[in-house]
Amino acid sequence: MPPASDAHAAPDAAASTSASPQSCAAPPDTLPVTVRWLGETPYDACFDAMRAFTDARTPDTGDEIWVVEHPPVYTLGQAGNPAHLLVADSGVPLVKVDRGGQITYHGPGQIVAYLLIDLRRRKLMVRTLVTRIEQAVIETLAAYNLASVRKAGAPGIYVESGPHHGAKIAALGLKIRNGCSYHGLSVNVKMDLRPFLAINPCGYAGLETVDMASLGATADWHEVARTLVRRLIANLDGATAAAALPQQALEQSND
């Protein structure tokens, strides 16, 4: 999923004029986060659904996290440079989207989590939301003995040390519309990394991209996804809320 100059998030320039009087107003209480497991879903379907969800929000709409795995697709942020797609005939579709950031790849074996969060109701600055998302990813990787860090000016999460020092393992890009976020993050678990060779990941030529498996982690997609959901809830609503998550919220059956 910072101010307008930060590549993490793309604010809606028309938000101050296009919002209806009800859009994302601040009710007194924070509503619980709903977790939805969408299985393998085409990117376009999720893109359309999260925009529609955000446009239809009212002060009573609860926040949601959508967890999904996409078929192969490249996505290019709204200020992205198409030149960062190095192989035009790769066979992987390219979708231009309205998030911040440049080009990235989504595919099988990668967790994608979309964060549909009412920042106004939570009284959150965008930079604070980004920091909490990043921290959730760092904590998730740490649960599998993988040390990772942020990089100033380079959205995403990177390997801290070892043979793959500095390689990217997670990506982040948000859109803010009427005080509410959509888009989110991706974590590479165990995937075919070759499609990343056809792009400059997030606009950085020669940037190595890795997954958890190539770093020695053997956890499967669903296990890592459950860990990520817990850490996202903990960083958004606190450890008590994460501990109180019903089992159904951690099962791939409520899509």
Swiss-Prot record:
Report the pathway entry. Answer: Protein modification; protein lipoylation via endogenous pathway; protein N(6)-(lipoyl)lysine from octanoyl-[acyl-carrier-protein]: step 1/2
Q: What is its main location?
A: cytoplasm
Q: Where is the active site?
A: C202
Residues covered by the BPL/LPL catalytic domain: 59-240
| Catalytic reaction(s) noted | octanoyl-[ACP] + L-lysyl-[protein] = N(6)-octanoyl-L-lysyl-[protein] + holo-[ACP] + H(+)
This chain's protein is named: Octanoyltransferase
Q: In this chain's numbering, which residues are marked as the site (Lowers pKa of active site Cys)?
A: K168
Q: What class of enzyme is it?
A: transferase
**Which CDD domains does the record associate with it?**
LipB
